[in-house]
Amino acid sequence: MTTIIDYGIGNLRSIEKAFETVGATVHRTDDPAAIAEAERLVLPGVGAFRACIDEIRRRDLEGPIHDAIGRGVPFLGVCVGMQLLFETGYEKGEHEGLGVLPGHVAHFRETDAGMPDELTVPHMGWNAIEPTRDHPLLDELGATPYVYFVHSYHPVAEDADDVLTTTSYGHTFPSVVQRDNVFGVQFHPEKSQAAGLGLLDNFAALPTTEEAGRTVST
């Protein structure tokens, strides 16, 4: 069972439908106990970093999220949900994230002052993801699959080992991150056609406990 965390922000039906398309059993919940005990978790996210993390905390979901990650539950953050995995977000201020992965989230033009003007922000549309290593999450997606992005901010990972794929847009940024049982994708898999569905199918097939050899500190 794949559980989608419902914290009241965004249209969750699209990601839910994408999982159903690949044959996964999926449901949504905002119940802290159900999240803490889930077999597999997805944290979607759209909009502003602060609004998302504030709502997660208002609903007392941060603790259950950490509990589930600590149990080895496969966990996937999508778009802003991926950004929330990092320590700090700098969208309209400085905001504390979930702190699962070391690093921060910054605006494209703040991380690259020399970014060409013809590259508009937000980064919107299809772009390639370049794997840094093999992983079951990326199985059968092709050497450089194209996926769909809509974002103005991106993570800056402190640990290069956490970066599973990179994407170039003015500069190179992490587009998929992974540490043990924790995964994050900056793009929208539910909008990324075959590559996106393939990634969700791979995630749904991951074992409950990842044998990655690195421990996530929560």
Swiss-Prot record:
The protein's superkingdom reads Bacteria
What GO CC terms are in its UniProt record? cytoplasm
Reactions that this protein is recorded to catalyse = 5-[(5-phospho-1-deoxy-D-ribulos-1-ylimino)methylamino]-1-(5-phospho-beta-D-ribosyl)imidazole-4-carboxamide + L-glutamine = D-erythro-1-(imidazol-4-yl)glycerol 3-phosphate + 5-amino-1-(5-phospho-beta-D-ribosyl)imidazole-4-carboxamide + L-glutamate + H(+); L-glutamine + H2O = L-glutamate + NH4(+)
Q: In which pathway does it act?
A: Amino-acid biosynthesis; L-histidine biosynthesis; L-histidine from 5-phospho-alpha-D-ribose 1-diphosphate: step 5/9
Its localization reads: Cytoplasm
**GO biological process: one example:** L-histidine biosynthetic process
Lineage here is: Bacteria, Pseudomonadati, Rhodothermota, Rhodothermia, Rhodothermales
Query: What Pfam families does the annotation carry?
Result: GATase
Q: Per the UniProt record, which EC number(s) apply here? A: 4.3.2.10, 3.5.1.2
Active site annotation, chain numbering: 79 (nucleophile), 188, 190
* Alphabetically ordered keywords of this record: Amino-acid biosynthesis, Cytoplasm, Glutamine amidotransferase, Histidine biosynthesis, Hydrolase, Lyase
Matching CDD domains: GATase1_IGP_Synthase
Q: Is the keyword Cytoplasm in the record?
A: yes
The protein's role, per its UniProt record: IGPS catalyzes the conversion of PRFAR and glutamine to IGP, AICAR and glutamate. The HisH subunit catalyzes the hydrolysis of glutamine to glutamate and ammonia as part of the synthesis of IGP and AICAR. The resulting ammonia molecule is channeled to the active site of HisF.
**Single GO term (MF):** imidazoleglycerol-phosphate synthase activity
Q: Which organism is it from?
A: Salinibacter ruber (strain DSM 13855 / M31)
**UniProt name for this protein:** Imidazole glycerol phosphate synthase subunit HisH
Keyword Kinase in annotation: no
> Subunit structure, briefly?
Heterodimer of HisH and HisF.
Residue ranges of every copy of the Glutamine amidotransferase type-1 domain listed in the record = 1-213
